């Protein structure tokens, strides 16, 4: 049995390091990397189990350019919504593999802490529960895995919390205090759940590891690149320069636009996301924050 992680960024590297403890695990990306166990894309695609840790915005292009055997088993470890199509990652993968052959990984997990082998709990969601259990068995003892079948709920939580982390970073960057941040995060959880209900998700998903757990982590720590984007926006830095300086993908930026578009199409009330997008488009962080503080729900 061989496993390949597709994507050699921080998260992909952390997953590879964890999985190689007990299994024959390789890592691959579009560009050659000087990494232990690095293999070409062609070699990676010969593995039975694939774990995708690519940018959500680049996922479709990668899948179109590289042939995946429909019998291969896939774990989607990326978190985001495609901006152009407003499609969730499972919808993108359905164009290439049957839904019984993939699962979604979610939950509170900073790559740096996984690489340090610190205790971590993750959720694996899929309609094929046996496949979920199989992927769960790959992880070492310091990573506790749970399984469920709410794929869409896990995806919405993983994507939405990145946008809320930007909002939280803005609040902290403006030095509005712990009370304001707590209010923002709790209202953000309600907003995220309201959005998810439209897609038939389970309420417990939003209260568990995938939702509240990942949100509380991502929206309160400088280890979160999305939170750091918010901090810098509060300092009146331009988004383009922030992203260039970050030199990493902050999934919450593109995801915010996708959620805003989806919410408008479906008639879902998403005030926090709307204000974050307005800031991206030039609205002052002070005005946007004041608007949020005045909201009644």
From Swiss-Prot:
Pathway: Membrane lipid metabolism; glycerophospholipid metabolism. Its EC number is 1.1.1.94. It is found in: Cytoplasm. NADPH binds at residues 11, 33, 79, 111, 225, 249, 251. GO terms for cellular component: cytosol. The active site is at 161 (proton acceptor). One of its GO terms (biological process) is glycerophospholipid metabolic process. InterPro entries: 6-PGluconate_DH-like_C_sf, 6PGD_dom2, G3P_DH_NAD-dep, G3P_DH_NAD-dep_C, G3P_DH_NAD-dep_N, NAD(P)-bd_dom_sf. Its main location: cytoplasm. Pfam families: NAD_Gly3P_dh_C, NAD_Gly3P_dh_N. Sn-glycerol 3-phosphate binds at residues 79, 107, 109, 161, 214, 224-226. It catalyses: sn-glycerol 3-phosphate + NAD(+) = dihydroxyacetone phosphate + NADH + H(+); sn-glycerol 3-phosphate + NADP(+) = dihydroxyacetone phosphate + NADPH + H(+). It comes from the Bacteria. Keywords: Cytoplasm, Lipid biosynthesis, Lipid metabolism, NAD, NADP, Nucleotide-binding, Oxidoreductase, Phospholipid biosynthesis, Phospholipid metabolism. GO terms for molecular function: glycerol-3-phosphate dehydrogenase [NAD(P)+] activity; NAD binding. Belongs to the NAD-dependent glycerol-3-phosphate dehydrogenase family. HAMAP family: NAD_Glyc3P_dehydrog (MF_00394). NCBIfam families: PRK00094.1-2, PRK00094.1-4, PRK00094.2-1. Catalyzes the reduction of the glycolytic intermediate dihydroxyacetone phosphate (DHAP) to sn-glycerol 3-phosphate (G3P), the key precursor for phospholipid synthesis. This is Glycerol-3-phosphate dehydrogenase [NAD(P)+]. It comes from Campylobacter jejuni subsp. jejuni serotype O:23/36 (strain 81-176). The gene is gpsA.
């Amino acid at each position: 049995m061989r496993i390949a992680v597709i994507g050699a960024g921080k998260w992909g590297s952390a997953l590879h390091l964890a999985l190689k403890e007990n299994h024959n695990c390789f890592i691959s990306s579009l560009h050659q990397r000087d990494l232990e166990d690095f293999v070409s894309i062609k070699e990676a695609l010969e593995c039975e189990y694939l774990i995708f840790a690519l940018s959500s915005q680049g996922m479709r292009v990668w899948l179109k350019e590289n042939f995946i055997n429909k019998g291969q088993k896939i774990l989607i470890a990326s978190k985001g919504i495609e901006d152009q199509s407003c499609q969730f990652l499972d919808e993108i993968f359905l164009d290439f593999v049957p839904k019984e052959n993939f699962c979604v990984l979610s939950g509170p997990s900073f790559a740096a802490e996984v690489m340090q082998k610190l205790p971590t709990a993750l959720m694996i969601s899929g309609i094929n529960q046996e496949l979920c259990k199989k992927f769960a068995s790959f992880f070492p003892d310091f990573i506790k895995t749970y399984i469920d079948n709410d794929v869409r709920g896990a995806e919405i939580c993983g994507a939405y919390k990145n946008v809320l982390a930007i909002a939280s970073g803005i609040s902290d960057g403006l030095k509005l205090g712990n009370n304001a941040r707590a209010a923002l995060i709790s209202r953000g959880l309600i907003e995220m759940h309201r959005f998810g209900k439209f897609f038939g998700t389970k309420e417990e998903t939003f209260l568990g590891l995938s939702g509240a757990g990942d949100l509380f982590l991502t929206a309160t720590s400088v280890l979160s690149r999305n939170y750091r984007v918010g901090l810098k926006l509060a300092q009146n830095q331009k988004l383009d320069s922030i992203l260039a300086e970050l030199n990493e993908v902050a999934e919450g930026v593109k995801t915010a636009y996708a959620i805003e578009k989806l919410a408008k199409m479906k008639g879902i009330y998403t005030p926090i996301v709307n204000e974050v997008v307005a800031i991206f488009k030039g609205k002052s962080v002070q005005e946007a924050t004041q608007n949020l503080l005045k909201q009644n729900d």
